[in-house]
From Swiss-Prot:
A motif ('KMSKS' region) lies at residues 593-597. It comes from Bacillus cytotoxicus (strain DSM 22905 / CIP 110041 / 391-98 / NVH 391-98). ATP binds at K596. It is an enzyme of class 6 (ligase). Monomer. GO terms for molecular function: aminoacyl-tRNA deacylase activity; ATP binding; isoleucine-tRNA ligase activity; tRNA binding; zinc ion binding. PROSITE patterns: AA_TRNA_LIGASE_I. Catalyzes the attachment of isoleucine to tRNA(Ile). As IleRS can inadvertently accommodate and process structurally similar amino acids such as valine, to avoid such errors it has two additional distinct tRNA(Ile)-dependent editing activities. One activity is designated as 'pretransfer' editing and involves the hydrolysis of activated Val-AMP. The other activity is designated 'posttransfer' editing and involves deacylation of mischarged Val-tRNA(Ile). This is Isoleucine--tRNA ligase.
Length: 921
């Protein structure tokens, strides 16, 4: 007889190899066929809503690792919530207006300036939809479950109509105004930028010290002094109209040779050193406040430079006398307004100096630095020229430096509702907690929001102008434009004349002749996405405002979190979200930013093609996403190894349940052996720990708990010793069915617990599980802990056993290394435990040699009585020797009963009985 045919070895068709790149697309097809998203929504209908509102990625190009991290994190949460008593709809969105799309078309050879704006915009829309479709397929490939057939897209007419309503509501409350103000201006984009559209990079700039002669000392100065200013933007000097000093600072009049200079006393040493003064002498000092309204001369134009007081003046750098050009800086503008200065801005949209800068007209601002510096030298006003490298704002899209430039722009007044914004920040739950401080400080310090852009591809600012240039924004015009956009899309604004965009028969006292013109600027794209709480949450029946959660990268504190908060508080008085969760950026394995120049870009597509979506998802669960995270081939290799262990665990569980029918074969919990119930205690611990981790969005804790459970609790302990029972005993042996009962509970629970993270694998496992009826594991709820009367006592006792067992395993390892034994089944062990451990061992009814996976087990005396050759540990001494007897050909246990049965000479008594009773006809 072939004894191997009498062993109940694992049997399953569940494949050992994942082969995820091929298998996942087939699983996703099945999801599509069964309408998994709709089925989940149907099953959870009527439950409390949990709304995670998707911040819209920009529709341009393939998805990158940041997108993958973001969408997968969202998917974890939504999937978990739908399995724990919530209805959790997930509506994906796309941001589809703005400069990158215009640039993409220009790069493809589209001549924007040579066609009607409406025509160009149609091409932009087509391109945006192509990008949406491209990204949608890539997000689906990640296994993200969403309402992919009904996303929100910011260029869609219904969305644009709601955005117009948000604008109208803000205007009605007096929060929208037009003003001449310095804004971030990108000469390369020829448009104003919001704070969220700039990034800081190092730039080399001229650093100059310039003397301004005093023209009128107002009895405070004698008139022969010179103010010294410092600037890194010489090109702004043609726009200089004043000098700012701090009212509370002390200023020194310093004599150097025959000249007298005015600088802040605190900066005397620094300036003297920089300007290489020899024997400077402080003649006297004056308070900054005394210098107010004194007048200096512009160094190369025949005009005055007024001395003003400004709280923005610091002693961090420079001279304490600040060059002030109201057309080129926010602080300058504020001070200039206070003193009634004009807003002079001699730079055009392209960054070229105009005729208001005589002598430098036609020069690009950066190229004007040299001739202006030369002019200063020529007139004797240049005291020092050096070059410095400093952090300077750049256009985040064109990567080129930007300037501050005063232009007529539309603004949302943040000042008007700043206190409500700060209150809303306070009422929101922030994860990580520092998010609150970050957004609070941004809101506290930010200026008014410049919402106009001088571009073609965006939502028009719905303003009309009367014959006297008065802007017209009324409920009637706003509602009419919103309805037009809802019906025709915003392109109608560029296709029709102003009169055809106004309500029929519309009149206005400022237009007696009935003539009107329309605004040509469009809205900042942050106003687009920032209106989604109104256009999506409020509008869709399956969603609600405020959302439970916004989850984006940490760059969105100044972006979407901020713009959404601003529009929502302006319109509703409340934040659009109850909670905000942010994640870090994805870096390479060495912690460097990914860039084409370094060649270290990791793309999601490549990972999914080579390893599979579930490996990428498992990586997302493994990282501390609230900080910046790392990815590399080596890191992915480690994750793939963890995946292999999880998959092998599923395969082992399925294989050993091939002949198990839960309805007929399950053993009642009360009839399970202690060790089996202990395994259920460990399973309960896992269920509790994993669910708590999901609740707190701590996915790394989920990852580690599941990995440890599979490798330590199952593979290294329970499954290891269970093989001797599962394979060797008769099919219906009580102990075997008891173990199968536990394995079944473990399998079902584990499959559900991994579903949010490994949905493909979980749904691949699910149909193999005996007795399941649901079409997909996604249509089930998270497991509940199994009720056990003696759970706590079991845990205490068996945790102690596990501690002692680890000592035994160490002793066996030592004996193996010393060639006392081969495999552990060739060993006999005698334990000499502490009194406490002895009592515990004596109370165990299970076969201890099975639990230790040895052939013979004896309990000796106390730890003090152990022989010299025993291995001594904290809780026991262990004597390891060769087991007596022969090796059984069927179970490989060494036993003195081998040969006792005359028919089965090579089997131990246990195996001979099993074979006779079950396999002999």
């Amino acid at each position: 007889m072939e004894y191997k045919n009498t062993l109940l070895m694992p049997k399953t068709e569940f494949p050992m190899r994942g082969n995820l790149p091929k298998r996942e697309p087939a699983i996703q097809e099945k999801w599509a066929e069964m309408n998994i998203y709709e089925k989940v929504q149907e099953r959870t209908k009527g439950r409390p809503l949990f709304v995670l509102h998707d911040g819209p990625p920009y529709a341009n190009g393939d998805i990158h690792m940041g997108h993958a991290l973001n969408k997968v994190l969202k998917d974890f949460i939504v999937r978990y919530k739908s399995m724990t008593g919530y209805c959790a709809p997930y509506v994906p969105g796309w941001d589809t207006h703005g400069l990158p799309i215009e640039q993409a078309l220009t790069n493809k050879g589209v001549k924007r300036k040579e066609m009607p704006v409406a025509e160009f915009r149609k091409l932009c829309a087509e391109y945006a939809y192509e990008q949406v479709n491209r990204q949608r397929e890539q997000f689906k490939r990640l296994g993200v479950r969403a309402d992919w057939d009904h996303p929100y897209i910011t260029l869609e007419p219904a969305y644009e109509a709601q955005q117009i309503k948000v604008f109208g509501e803000m205007a009605k409350k007096g929060y929208i105004y037009k003003g001449q103000k310095p804004v971030y201006w990108s000469p390369t984009s020829e448009s104003a930028l919001a704070e969220a559209e700039i990034e800081y990079k190092d730039k080399k700039s001229a650093s100059i010290y310039v003397a301004f002669e005093v023209k009128d000392g107002k009895d405070v100065l004698e008139g022969d002094e010179k103010f010294i200013i410092w600037t890194t933007t010489p090109w702004t000097l043609p726009a200089n109209l004043g000098i700012s000093v701090h009212p509370k600072l002390e200023y020194s009049i310093v004599k150097v040779n025959d000249e007298k200079y005015i600088i802040a006393s605190d900066l005397f040493d620094t300036v003297a050193k920089t300007l290489e003064w020899e024997n400077p002498e402080v003649v006297r000092t004056v308070k900054g406040s005394e210098l107010e309204y004194t007048v200096a001369k512009h160094p190369f134009y025949d005009r005055d430079s007024l001395v003003m007081l400004g709280e923005h003046v610091t002693t961090d750098a420079g001279t304490g006398c600040v060059h002030t050009a109201p057309g080129h800086g926010e602080d300058d503008f504020i001070v200039g307004q206070k003193y009634g200065l004009e807003v002079l801005c001699p730079v055009d949209d392209k960054g070229v100096l105009t005729s208001e800068a005589p002598g430098f007209e036609g020069l690009f601002y950066d190229k004007a630095n040299k001739p202006i510096t030369e002019k200063l030298e020529e007139v004797g006003a240049l005291l020092k020229l050096t070059f410095i490298t400093h952090s300077y704002p750049h256009d985040w899209r064109t990567k080129k430096p930007i300037i501050f430039r005063a232009t007529a722009q539309w603004f949302a007044s943040i000042e008007a509702f700043r206190s409500e914004l700060l209150q809303a920040v306070k009422e929101t739950k922030w994860v990580p907690a520092w998010g609150e401080t970050r957004l609070h400080n941004m809101v506290r310090d930010r200026g008014d929001w410049c919402i106009s852009r001088q571009r073609a591809w965006g939502v028009p600012i719905p303003v009309f102008y009367a014959e006297n240039n008065d802007p017209i924004i009324t409920d009637e015009t706003i509602n009419h434009v919103a309805n037009l956009f809802r019906e025709h899309g915003s392109n109608v604004w560029f296709e029709r004349e102003a009169k055809d965009l106004l309500p029929e028969g519309f009149t206005h006292p400022s237009s007696p002749n009935g003539e009107f013109r329309k605004e040509t600027d469009i809205m900042d794209v942050w106003f687009d996405s920032g209106s989604s709480h109104q256009a999506v949450l409020e509008e869709r029946d399956d969603l609600q405002r405020p959302a439970d959660l916004y989850l984006e990268g940490s760059d969105q504190y100044r972006g979407w979190f901020n713009s959404s908060l601003s529009t929502a508080v302006a319109v509703t008085g409340k934040a659009p979200y109850k909670g905000v969760l942010s994640h870090g950026f994805v870096l390479d394995g060495e912690g460097r930013k990914m860039s084409k120049s370094i060649g270290n870009i990791v793309v999601p597509k490549k990972i999914m093609d080579q390893l599979g979506g579930d490996i990428l998802r498992l990586w997302v669960s493994s990282v501390d996403y609230q900080s910046d995270v790392r990815i590399s081939d080596d890191i992915l290799k480690q994750v793939a190894e963890v995946y292999r262990k999880i998959r092998n665990t599923f395969r082992f569980l399925l294989g050993n349940l091939a002949d198990f029918n839960p309805a007929q074969d399950a053993v009642a919990k009360a009839e399970l052996r202690e060790v089996d119930r202990y395994m259920l205690v460990k399973l309960n611990d896992l269920i509790t720990k994993v669910k708590e981790a999901y609740e707190t969005y701590d996915f790394a804790a989920v990852y580690h708990a599941i990995h440890n459970f599979c490798t330590i609790d199952l593979s290294s302990f329970y499954l290891d010793f269970a093989k001797d029972i599962l394979y060797i005993e008769a099919a219906n042996h009580h102990d075997r069915r008891a173990i199968q009962t536990v394995l079944y509970d473990v399998l079902v629970a584990l499959t559900k617990l991994v579903t949010p993270i490994l949905p493909h694998t979980a749904d691949e496992v699910w149909p193999y599980i005996p007795g399941v009826t649901e079409e997909s594991v996604q249509l089930t709820d998270m497991p509940e802990a199994i009720e056990l009367q003696d759970g706590e006592a079991l845990k205490t006792k068996w945790d102690a056993f596990m501690t002692l067992r680890s000592d035994v395993l160490k002793a066996l390892e030592v004996a193996r290394n010393e060639k006392v034994i081969g495999k552990s089944l060739t060993a006999s062990i005698t334990l000499f435990p502490t009194a406490e451990m002895k009592e515990m061992l004596e109370s165990i009814q299970e076969d201890l040699k099975q639990l230790f996976i040895v052939s013979e087990y004896k309990l000796g005396g106390t730890i003090e009585e152990a022989p010299a050759d025993a291995q001594k540990y904290e809780h026991t001494a262990v004597l390891v020797t060769q087991a007596n007897g022969e090796t059984c050909e069927r179970c490989w246990v060494v036993s003195e009963t081998v040969g006792n049965d005359n028919e089965y000479k090579t089997l131990c008594e246990r195996c001979a009985t099993v074979v006779k009773e079950n396999y002999v006809k």
